[in-house]
């Protein structure tokens, strides 16, 4: 069995390399992506607004990880955008949503924070938790990393298959928007069951029992201090 993730489309801007999976922490720091090879590098100045630069893909036993970067500017992935992710999970361009030469069973609209998966020509709406989606950073940035659960209905066709390979397209749908890849047909990738370095969870234990810990987080409402 072929192991790792491999790029199959050949172009001066594509790089082909078989690799094993990498455990990635979706924290917006990107240091754990250094060892993951670029599978697509896009031309500069081929878009009006959001101009994609590079794309990386890897995985562990639970998640598919995707990293992408823009040539210039900063963007907010949670709102105010028309970025779409398309994944063809059955490698059949005749099924699913038609997008730049692929038939995507999983479609995600980052700006709307929603999407759908297609099965038997029906669109099944999904939200972030349905595909275990993680996106970082949650502020404006030039680069982003995301994770999607390998057992999510969008990748398993609602449990009918174990996801092992597919094709991906990333786009800004607005007029003049950019695509990864530029050519139709998407980017092929594999998810294998090769041996992987286990992710080491970050401990939340106190270094010193005498320390006092203060936790802060963003909320939609002031539930912590507003008793109503």
List each language-model region with its residue ranges.
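Short, well-ordered beta-strand segments enriched in hydrophobic/aromatic residues
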Residues: 28, 62-72, 144-150
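Glycine-aromatic-enriched beta-strand/loop faces of beta-sandwich-type recognition domains
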Residues: 107-139
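Acidic/polar low-complexity flexible segments
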Residues: 21-29, 82, 86-113, 139-141, ...
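Low-complexity, serine/threonine/proline/glycine-rich extracellular segments that form mucin-like
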Residues: 60-65, 69-89
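Sec-dependent N-terminal signal peptides
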Residues: 4-20
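N-terminal, active-site-proximal structural segment of metallo-dependent hydrolase catalytic domains
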Residues: 192-228
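A short beta-turn/strand-edge loop motif at beta-sheet boundaries
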Residues: 46, 73-79, 154-160
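Short, solvent-exposed loop/turn elements at domain surfaces
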Residues: 32-38, 75-77, 94-95, 213, ...
């Amino acid at each position: 069995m072929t192991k790792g993730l491999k790029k199959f489309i050949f172009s001066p801007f594509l790089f082909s390399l078989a690799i094993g999976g990498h455990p990635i922490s979706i924290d917006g720091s990107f240091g754990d992506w250094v060892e993951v090879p670029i599978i697509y590098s896009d031309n500069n100045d081929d878009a009006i607004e959001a101009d994609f630069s590079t794309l990386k893909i890897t995985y562990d036993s639970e998640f598919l990880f995707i990293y992408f970067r823009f040539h210039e500017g900063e963007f907010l992935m949670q709102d105010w955008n028309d970025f779409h992710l398309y994944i063809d999970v059955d490698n059949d361009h005749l099924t699913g949503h038609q997008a730049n030469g692929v038939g995507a069973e999983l479609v995600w609209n980052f700006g709307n924070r929603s999407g759908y998966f297609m099965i038997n020509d029906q669109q099944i709406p999904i939200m972030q938790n349905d595909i275990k989606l993680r996106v970082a950073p949650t502020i404006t940035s030039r680069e982003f990393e995301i994770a999607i659960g390998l057992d999510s209905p969008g990748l398993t066709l609602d449990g009918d298959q174990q996801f092992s390979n597919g094709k991906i397209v990333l786009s800004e749908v607005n007029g003049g928007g950019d695509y990864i890849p530029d050519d139709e047909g998407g980017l092929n990738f594999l998810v294998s069951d090769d041996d992987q370095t286990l992710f080491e969870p970050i401990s939340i234990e106190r270094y010193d029992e005498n320390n006092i810990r203060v936790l802060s987080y963003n909320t939609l409402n002031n539930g912590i201090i507003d008793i109503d």
